């Protein structure tokens, strides 16, 4: 009787994960059936990949990782595959750097990600397990190179989970952590659901962005918990000095998320393809370096428009609100001259922020455009910011009602060159 109950429980569990994921055939490929040990010592790469390939051959289905630690080099997911990580399962990236082959990724030299899919559709990663990139040795290498003082001494690091030119993607329930670099990257992909996941990395781990949609569209991110070393979300669409062509990121909703350590919710700075129709609502920031941040500069910009934020609360966030066409600096010099408008000049406009509360900030922030491309149509409603320093506005058109900035030092709202401000 107990055996029958266990079989019924397993069947119900698998039925539930199928219902949650994009439609797949009902094949179940348990990686243990293909030789996986799950002991944290044996490399299970071949077994996991064999399970993926077998499921694909059957028309799709679930690749199942039951409780255990599966040490692995990179694996590649295929169409109609649900990689399901049971509670207590860990897919652990190999710490052997030689296991990550060199590839051209995002037009640049890179290393293959631990989990990736390319030109695939109906792909999901679900469950209550963990994907761990074992990034510690990569971070140490990155710090060593940075501290060497040798300019241009970059060495590529792998991302953790990448969807490249994919459609109909779901990530649900899992924890993603300790990536060598960016953690979850949809690249030129479409129709993506990211819900109820955690993305984690130590606060000072370099470049460990949580979620970085890159030239991707129709994305729904909800109940994301991010506690990382860089951007909690960074929406991107094209690198600095991009030769083009670049595609925008657009039609993205971000709701009911919590961000702890990290650099906040960002659009940019690599935004050479532009970004439109992005909405964030009910976001809680606690101790991030930044809150809302839209950033670009003269060598990586494009049209960034129809952006809205609603019901945002922040506690002990260093910079509450940054909208800057002068990244990485927040404020330009007083004598900043106009420059010729090019294909990569940023154009920020039609940005709305409703109901934002921030307490304990070091700075209320800045809204800073370029003299040749002033920011237009920023509308603020019901902003209540308490900070050591106020909000600086230059080369920008800002209007709104119910805006209260309390600054312990200096002006609450400082208007500099090119500021057109109508706040009540």
What are these regions, as identified by a protein language model?
Residues 9-19:
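Bacterial N-terminal signal peptides
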């Amino acid at each position: 009787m107990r055996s029958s109950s266990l079989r019924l429980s397993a069947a119900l569990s698998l039925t539930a994960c199928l219902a949650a994921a994009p439609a797949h055939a009902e094949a179940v490929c348990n990686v243990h059936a293909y030789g996986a040990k799950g002991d944290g010592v044996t490399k299970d790469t071949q077994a996991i990949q064999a399970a993926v390939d077998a499921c694909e051959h059957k028309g799709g289905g679930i690749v199942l990782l039951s409780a255990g630690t599966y040490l692995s080099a990179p694996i590649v997911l295929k169409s109609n595959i649900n990689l399901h990580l049971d509670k207590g399962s860990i897919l652990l990236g190999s710490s052997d750097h030689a296991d990550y082959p060199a590839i051209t990724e995002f037009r640049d030299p890179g290393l293959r990600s631990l989990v990736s899919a390319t030109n695939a559709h109906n792909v999901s990663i679900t469950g209550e397990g963990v994907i761990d990139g074992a990034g510690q040795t990569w971070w140490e290498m990155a710090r060593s190179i940075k501290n060497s003082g040798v300019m241009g001494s970059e060495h590529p690091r792998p991302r953790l989970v990448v969807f490249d030119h994919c459609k109909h993607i779901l990530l649900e329930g899992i924890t993603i952590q300790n990536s060598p670099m960016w953690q979850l990257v949809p690249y030129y992909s479409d129709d993506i659901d990211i819900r109820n996941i955690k993305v984690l990395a130590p606060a000072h781990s370099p470049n460990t962005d949580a979620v970085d949609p890159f030239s991707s569209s129709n994305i729904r991110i909800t109940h994301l918990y991010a506690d990382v070393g860089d951007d909690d979300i960074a929406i991107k669409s094209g690198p600095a000095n991009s030769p083009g062509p670049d595609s925008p990121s657009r039609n993205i909703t971000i709701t009911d998320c919590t961000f702890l350590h990290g650099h906040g919710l960002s659009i940019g700075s690599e935004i050479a393809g532009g970004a439109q129709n992005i909405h964030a609502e009910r976001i809680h920031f606690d101790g991030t370096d930044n809150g809302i941040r839209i950033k670009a500069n003269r060598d990586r910009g494009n049209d960034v428009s129809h952006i809205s934020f609603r019901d945002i609360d922040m506690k002990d966030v260093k910079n509450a609100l940054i909208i800057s066409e002068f990244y990485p600096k927040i404020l330009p010099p007083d004598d900043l001259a106009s420059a010729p408008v090019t294909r990569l000049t940023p154009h920020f406009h039609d940005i709305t922020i409703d109901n934002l509360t921030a307490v304990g900030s070091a700075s209320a922030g800045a809204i800073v455009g370029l003299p040749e491309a002033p920011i237009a149509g920023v509308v603020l409603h019901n902003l209540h910011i308490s900070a050591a320093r106020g909000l600086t506005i230059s080369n920008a058109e800002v209007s709104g009602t119910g805006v209260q900035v309390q600054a312990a030092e200096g002006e609450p709202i400082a208007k500099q060159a090119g500021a057109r401000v109508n706040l009540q």
